[in-house]
Structures are given as C-alpha cells and as structure tokens.
Amino acid sequence: MLRTMLQGKLHRVKVTQADLHYEGSCAIDQDFMDAAGILENEAIDIYNVDNGERFSTYAICAERGSGIISVNGAAARRAAVGDRLIICSYVQIPDSDARSHKPNIAYFEGDNEMKRIAKAVPVQVA
C-alpha cells in the first residue's frame, strides 16, 4: 500500500505578484524550492491563510534570491499581493516507510525571509 505524505512545505510565504494573464502556475524563488525539495513542474497545493482559498497548480522557477512568489493564471483570482500562503508538495511512499518519512519544511516571516528549516511539524499543544 502507498501512503500520500507531506514532502515539502513553504510555511507563510507572502505573495509578491499575481498575474491573471501569465500562463498558469506558481513561480517560486529557486532557493525556496530547494529548501522544501519542490521541483520545477511539480504539482503543488496552495492554502491561502488570509482568505481560506485552497487550490492546486504546479511550481515553476523564479529567479534565485529574488523572494518571488507569483500566483499566475486563473489562480491569481485566489490570491492577492501580500497574502500569506502555505505551499505544499506530497509524495507517495510505501506504508513500510511512512512512519520514518521526514518532510522538508521552510518557515518564513516578513517579506519572504526564510527563518528556519525543519524536518517535522511541531506537536500541537493545548
């Protein structure tokens, strides 16, 4: 049996561009993609923290070091410049490997400043 597990996550990145007329996708600073292990053309899910929208698209590379998060095409109607997003990719792995699997998680603050990288989501406490 295969399980679908979180592979990579960009937590609370800020949208820098939203271009309705650009070919669909989400352009992501290459440094951010590397930190989360997200590949060019990989399917991603986007969760908009500010308006609750959830949608799927694919990742394309933005210039390394640019801080760009650009939501393009029809998805530009679901995110505005300044919105905070969570961007995730997933992987299917055998059940036997699922419990030892560690995702790549990059945390952001301010104007897309990467603050830390982790291999697990913290345990939620009461």
From Swiss-Prot:
Active site: 25 (schiff-base intermediate with substrate), 58 (proton donor)
InterPro entries in alphabetical order: Asp_de-COase-like_dom_sf, Asp_decarbox
GO biological process assignments: alanine biosynthetic process; pantothenate biosynthetic process
Reactions the enzyme catalyzes: L-aspartate + H(+) = beta-alanine + CO2
Biological or metabolic pathway of the protein: Cofactor biosynthesis; (R)-pantothenate biosynthesis; beta-alanine from L-aspartate: step 1/1
Positions of post-translational Pyruvic acid (Ser) modification: 25
Post-translational modification note: Is synthesized initially as an inactive proenzyme, which is activated by self-cleavage at a specific serine bond to produce a beta-subunit with a hydroxyl group at its C-terminus and an alpha-subunit with a pyruvoyl group at its N-terminus.
Family annotation (CDD domains): Asp_decarbox
Coiled coil: none
GO cellular component, one term: cytosol
Positions of substrate binding: 57, 73-75
Entry EC no(s): 4.1.1.11
GO molecular function, one term: aspartate 1-decarboxylase activity
Subcellular location per the Swiss-Prot or TrEMBL entry: Cytoplasm
Annotated NCBIfam families: panD
Entry function: Catalyzes the pyruvoyl-dependent decarboxylation of aspartate to produce beta-alanine.
The name this protein goes by in its record: Aspartate 1-decarboxylase
